[in-house]
Amino acid sequence: MSIITDVYAREVLDSRGNPTLEVEVYTESGAFGRGMVPSGASTGEHEAVELRDGDKSRYGGLGTQKAVDNVNNIIAEAVIGYDVRDQQAIDRAMIALDGTPNKGKLGANAILGVSIAVARAAADYLEIPLYSYLGGFNTKVLPTPMMNIINGGSHSDAPIAFQEFMIVPAGAPTFKEALRWGAEIFHALKKILKSRGLATAVGDEGGFAPRFDGTEDGVETILAAIEAAGYVPGKDVFLGFDCASSEFYDKERKVYDYTKFEGEGAAVRTADEQIDYLEELVNKYPIITIEDGMDENDWDGWKKLTERLGKKVQPVGDDFFVTNTSYLEKGINEACANSILIKVNQIGTLTETFDAIEMAKEAGYTAVVSHRSGETEDSTIADIAVAANAGQIKTGSLSRTDRIAKYNQLLRIEDQLGEVAEYRGLKSFYNLSK
């Protein structure tokens, strides 16, 4: 009764109006699962391959019909007949069917869509929530959210190099309260921006994208919004950055060139100067997490950054690790970073996603489950964060339904868990000494 009888993919649109995949899996019992695949704007060069059509006459070359056809004509034939509950076997079968190290033949987007849909169908068959199916009986930790309320870099047209300015309501007693705090700060920030005559349009991830006078102006404005909402920076609410440094790293000159986003007169920094600058910000502001502070291939820089700041903040590897256990293992061995960002489409299956989370935890690294800038209404990452007891999630600002869908799912999960639910706040940053 739990045998897969049909797999079907279609092309749908993501939050940027670009094509992506939606996959449906059906079983003999009538149990059903659907998965939708996100897409990134600033992507690591070592990520699994997102297969696009390249036909400029259709969606500007971004169509996903090749990936859809791979699901319907190749993958479906391979997985029909499997027990839908055998997630690892199905994921491994798809990896073997692709046969490349980066899923470049079938496409990580094709494989991931099936992987998510299989898990959802299994949960439906067992009549249990997805987080319970993926995580088992010890699932209980609601993640501390990192809310991207200012969008810069490749996620907006704002003249700021850093891609994300985040608030982290780690002092809240519950996830529900953390979400409320974040929403109140978001609206307080909007009022401040309006009072300054700055734009309140939002970027890809729902954060504002105003023309600040540099990074520190953005930080100071966020701190003012936290206080205006009635909260205390550094006690109730902390700050975080996604620098996305690879987006403005000049490989030929080996410098971090802020002029790419901030224009003429902006800083151009060596690796050591980049670390000095980040340390200045950490010493001045209540920053608790810095993602991709160095270029994805700057291993020496990552090691120095971790040595300097790894006890004060969590240096998080996103483009640096690309949710891949091979890169993570190297990072652990070389003492680079102390946290990994988890993006399901960077690696392409749920099995490999959980492998990366487990490896991180065993090494004392934290795992931050994350969305992509091109999202859908699919809320699977909310269930993954709870299933893995990851303790941290990054899923955008307090606007745009593609972001709110994940927050609302976490509210449902918190309700379902009842008294068992734990919101650990600062304790989720167990890799820090402060």
Swiss-Prot record:
Alphabetized UniProt keyword annotations: Cytoplasm, Glycolysis, Lyase, Magnesium, Metal-binding, Secreted
Name of this chain's protein: Enolase
Location in or out of the cell: Cytoplasm; Secreted; Cell surface
Binding site for Mg(2+): D242, E291, D318
Any one biological process term the GO annotation gives: glycolytic process
Cofactor(s) the protein needs: Mg(2+)
HAMAP family from the UniProt entry: Enolase
Alphabetical list of PANTHER family matching this protein: ENOLASE
Catalytic reaction equation(s): (2R)-2-phosphoglycerate = phosphoenolpyruvate + H2O
Gene3D superfamilies per record: Enolase-like C-terminal domain, Enolase-like, N-terminal domain
Family: Belongs to the enolase family.
Pathway: Carbohydrate degradation; glycolysis; pyruvate from D-glyceraldehyde 3-phosphate: step 4/5
Classification via Pfam families: Enolase_C (PF00113), Enolase_N (PF03952)
Binding sites annotated in the UniProt record for (2R)-2-phosphoglycerate: Q163, K343, R372, S373, K394
Cofactor note: Binds a second Mg(2+) ion via substrate during catalysis.
Catalytic residues identified in the record: E205, K343
Transmembrane segments: none
EC number of this enzyme: 4.2.1.11
GO MF: magnesium ion binding; phosphopyruvate hydratase activity
Coiled coil location: none
Function: Catalyzes the reversible conversion of 2-phosphoglycerate (2-PG) into phosphoenolpyruvate (PEP). It is essential for the degradation of carbohydrates via glycolysis.
Domain of life: Bacteria
UniProt GO cellular component terms: cell surface; extracellular region; peptidoglycan-based cell wall; phosphopyruvate hydratase complex
